[in-house]
């Protein structure tokens, strides 16, 4: 009789492990999904809009009011271009963002034009 009881004990032991294995695996899958979601959410870049045309037009309007020679005008344009690129790059790196020009955005992306224009002005004042 002991030989017939032994397989029953092994089967009962396996069932006991089954009840702990399934919830444990489900918990691991849920934890893995939560960690994966968090990693993706933290690393996903933010999309913002920048009105390049308005910024460049404002610069050229301001520059046209000054009496500058052609060489001075070229130097000022080069400084503006350098300040514009540096400002956009710095903002993009600081905020882990994708910057799109305003016409490419239908809605929903915050506009950073004013912030970039202020940074360009600060950079232009700082450079000789």
Curated annotation (Swiss-Prot):
One of its GO terms (cellular component) is plasma membrane. It is a single-pass membrane protein. Keywords: Cell inner membrane, Cell membrane, Membrane, Plasmid, Transmembrane, Transmembrane helix. It comes from the Bacteria. Disruption phenotype: Expresses approximately normal numbers of F pili that are unusually long, remains plasmid transfer proficient, displays increased resistance to F-pilus-specific phage. Resistant to phage R17 and M13, conjugates at lower efficiency (about 10% of wild-type), resistant to CdiA-CT toxin. The chain crosses the membrane at residues 18-40. InterPro entries: TrbI_Ftype. It is found in: Cell inner membrane. Its main location: membrane. NCBIfam families: PRK13717.1, TrbI_Ftype. May influence the kinetics of pilus outgrowth and/or retraction. Overexpression phenocopies the deletion mutation; i.e. causes resistance to F-pilus-specific phage and CdiA-CT toxin. This is Protein TrbI. It comes from Escherichia coli (strain K12). The lineage of its organism: Bacteria, Pseudomonadati, Pseudomonadota, Gammaproteobacteria, Enterobacterales.
């Amino acid at each position: 009789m002991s030989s017939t009881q032994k397989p029953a004990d092994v089967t009962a032991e396996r069932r006991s492990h089954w009840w702990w294995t399934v919830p444990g695996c489900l918990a691991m899958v849920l934890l893995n999904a939560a960690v994966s979601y968090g990693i993706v959410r933290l690393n996903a870049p933010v999309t913002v809009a920048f009105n390049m045309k308005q910024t460049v037009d404002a610069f050229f309007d301001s520059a046209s009011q000054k009496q500058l020679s052609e060489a001075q005008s070229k130097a000022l344009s080069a400084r503006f271009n350098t300040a514009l690129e540096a400002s956009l790059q710095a903002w993009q790196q600081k905020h882990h963002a994708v910057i799109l020009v305003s016409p490419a955005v239908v809605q929903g992306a915050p506009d950073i034009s004013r912030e970039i224009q202020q940074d360009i002005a600060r950079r232009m004042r700082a450079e000789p």
